[in-house]
Design a protein with these regions (language model features):
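Alpha-solenoid helical repeat scaffolds
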Residues: 30, 70-73, 77, 124, ...
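Short coil turns that delineate tetratricopeptide repeat
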Residues: 37-39, 84, 131, 165, ...
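Terminal, low-structured helical/coil segments at or just beyond the last alpha-helical repeat
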Residues: 178, 183-226
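Extended amphipathic alpha-helical interaction segments
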Residues: 88-192
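Start-of-domain marker
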Residues: 6-70
Length: 226
């Protein structure tokens, strides 16, 4: 009997990441993504995302790697498509928390600057990372409204509503839950300001069970519902 080939564990990439040898990590990981035997393995793409993400905040890399953050997102999306369950990247939970925060922060900046096409793309990275991120779909829907993409907005809001109404939305992570709360509050207040109170109340009711003890949510709920 022949032993079945096991998928590589890419411990060499982990070692380079831990040792902060990021350029070497990128070179090695890219080699795996171009190799016929390993190009469909998810971890090399994740390590490329992690490497670029670290480099994006280190001054000495800014000149040679000016697009490090964008490249981090690009490879994060590639990883997510290959690892639907995120099982292979489970031990790197801190990275996912950090990059999600960075994406949300960058999207907020883009929204403030009315660069909605860019913020829309950033929210897409969040939904690529977690297809049950109802908050990301709500915010994505709002950006579609801002750029007058009515059909796409309807699709995003419909997805968010389905996730909330079927209890499939991701709320186990506290930061993701807070993002959902903020998205619901922002969208509900936007609807209410447009004299669409019934829709605002509907959205708040969809998320209410997740925020029964959250003062901020309850204050906004009371101010809109009355």
């Amino acid at each position: 009997m022949f032993a079945s080939a096991q998928a590589p564990d890419f411990r060499d990439l982990l070692s380079m990441f831990v040792d902060e040898k990021y350029p070497k990590l990128l070179q090695k990981a890219e080699g795996y993504t171009l190799n016929e035997k390993t190009k469909k393995e998810a971890l090399p793409y994740l390590f490329m995302s992690m490497g670029y993400y670290k480099m994006s905040s280190i001054d000495k890399y800014k000149e040679d790697y000016p697009d490090a953050f964008n490249n981090s997102l690009k490879y994060l999306s590639k990883y997510a498509k290959l690892d639907k369950t995120k099982e292979s990247g489970a031990e790197y939970g801190d990275f996912f928390i950090d990059i999600r925060k960075s994406i949300i922060s960058e999207a907020e900046i883009m929204n403030d600057q009315q660069k909605y096409t860019k913020s829309k793309a950033l929210y897409k990275y969040l939904t690529d990372l977690d297809a049950n991120d109802a908050g990301a779909f709500i915010m994505q829907g709002m950006t579609f409204v801002a750029i007058k993409s009515k059909k796409e907005a309807e699709t995003a809001f419909k997805t968010a509503k389905e996730l909330l109404s079927t209890d499939k939305c991701s709320v186990s992570d506290k930061d993701q839950k807070a993002f959902l709360k903020n998205a619901l509050i922002e969208y509900a207040n936007s609807l209410n300001s447009q004299s669409r109170k019934s829709e605002a109340v509907e959205w708040l009711n969809l998320g209410k069970k997740h925020f029964e003890d959250d003062k901020e949510f309850q204050v906004n709920y009371s101010s809109i519902v009355g």
